[in-house]
Amino acid sequence: MNDISLKQLEIFVAVVEYGGFTRAAEELFFNQSTVSAHISLLEQALGKELFVRSNRRHVRLTKEGEQVYPIARRILNDCAALRTLFSDADSAPAVALGASTVPGQYLVPGYLAAFLKREPEFRYSLRRGDSEQVHRMLKSGQIAVGFVGAVSEPENVDYFPLYDDRLVLAALNNEHYRMLRERGVYGRELLLEEPFVSREEGSGTDTSLQNYLRTLGLSHDMLHVVARVDDPEAIKQMVSGGVGVAVLSALAVEQEVQNGTLLAFEIDKSALKRTIYLITLKSQQLSRMEQKLVDFLKSPHRRKRAEAQN
């Protein structure tokens, strides 16, 4: 049997977790031929085909591939744990973090600033994406700790509720919308009537909205969507410019509501809430600094102090 390398296992796991050769190559910054070559070498070493190759964008595991995947993932996790086992504060690498848009912009910076005051040697990198992308970063080992607004993989991921957020319908502060506010209109009454600026698919905000619409017997396709935008700041500019209304986190529009630029309608009589979660991989052993950060964030009074300083 030929030797098996960690690089081969890393690429194999990436193809599985990203769902195809093309996406794995993009995420690992390799070309597709490099990814294919490493997979071929791994298959030669094992003497088995690991993927059913219908096309390069979407692949599925063979029976043998399904047996190899959990072992390969465990080996990569153990190697990551070994790298941090004897690291001290001075030589410890930066903690790799990932956050979806809303927590990454409006919540996590305050948490990290508070933790940095407590642990001056703390160093971190913060990657941004939607909730689905952050889950993929976690599973592929690109980050150790994540912050998301949606639950998608409870069998593999530990979710700790950090913050109870609520979604509101944001509208331009003009006479038309002020009259509707005075009449006690809820945001759900405007969803089907007004031009709508939507968050991108895969975001926690979009997932929460689609779940809510289903409870009403509605779908996202029934909204008059004029644009899909992946940045709440850009969406607020569009709403301020009169393009349409939008469903956003109350955190995202707090300042604009206070200064009178935007109005925030409650979506329904019962506020539409969603939870911001701290996530870690169940199978991964955290480094000492990563564990310190997680323990800090799980302390309610420490979080409250950090939120008050945001």
Give the positions of each predicted feature.
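Flexible hinge/capping segments at coil-to-helix
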Residues: V157-V197, E201
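Central regulatory/effector-binding core of bacterial HTH transcription factors
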Residues: A92-E155
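Short helix-boundary/capping micro-motifs
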Residues: V13-N31
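A short LG(V/I)-centered, amphipathic sequence patch enriched
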Residues: E43-L61
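Hydrophobic hinge/microswitch elements
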Residues: D130-V134, K139-I143, V148-G149, N211-R214, ...
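Secondary-structure junction motif
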Residues: R178, G187, E194-G217, L286-E290, ...
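A late-sequence structural motif
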Residues: L107, L263-E307
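Alpha-helical linker/hinge and terminal dimerization helices associated
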Residues: A45-L46, V68-A89, K304
